[in-house]
Amino acid sequence: MTPATRNNDSAVAVADAFDDTGDGPPTAARFAALAACWRQPDDDLQAALAAETDTTVDAQSLRAEYTRLFVGPGPSQSPPYESVYRDGERDADLGPVYGSSTQAVARWYSEYGLQPAASESAPPDHLATELEFAAYLREHEGAETLEQFLTEHPRNWVESFARRVRDADPKPFYRTLLNVTVDTLARADTPL
C-alpha cells in the first residue's frame, strides 16, 4: 500500500509486533508486522523471523504451508480474502474473489489517498492489505476511524476465515499467527 507501512524494515516490524503484549490497544507496528506475516513468505520475512526468534525458519516449508492453506493447487482451503466470506449466497457458501466487499474496502483506501502498491497482485481485500491499512489508520487517524474500519471489514469475516484455517490443521507458525491476529482485532477497540 502506498504510502503506508510497507517501507518498514521487516525485522523491526516483526520484533515490535510480537513484543506488543498486554491489555492495551495494538500498535501500528503490530498491525504492520501481522500484515507482513500474512503475505506470501519471502526471504525478508524468513530473515526477520529467524532474527527475532533465534531459530532457523525453513522458508521452503513456510512457503509450502502458505500455498497449501491459502493458494492451492486446486481450490484454496482458506482463501485470505474478505469477499470470499462475505459475498456468498448463503453463509456456508464461499463467495467470489473480487466481490462487492472488495470494492467496499478499496473505497476506504481511496478515501485516505492510498492504493495497493503496483507490485501487489492480491486483491485489495486480502487480509494482509486490510491489516496494513489498519496500521496506517492506527498511526495517522483516530481510534474511532480505526474501529469503524475494523468493524466494517476484518472483524466481519476473520472468524469464518479462522475456522477454515483451523479446520485445515495448520502448522504452528500459521496457527500462532492466526491466534495473534484474532486477538489483535479483538483488542483493537481498546481506547488509546
From Swiss-Prot:
Induction: By anaerobic conditions. Its expression is under the control of DmsR. InterPro entries: DMSO/NO3_reduct_chaperone (IPR020945), TorD-like_sf (IPR036411), TorD/DmsD_chaperones (IPR050289). Signal peptide: none annotated. The keyword Transferase does not apply. Disruption phenotype: Cells lacking this gene fail to grow under anaerobic conditions using either DMSO or TMAO as terminal electron acceptors. It comes from the Archaea. Keywords: Chaperone. May be involved in the biogenesis/assembly of dimethyl sulfoxide (DMSO) reductase. Belongs to the TorD/DmsD family. This is Putative dimethyl sulfoxide reductase chaperone. The lineage of its organism: Archaea, Methanobacteriati, Methanobacteriota, Stenosarchaea group, Halobacteria.
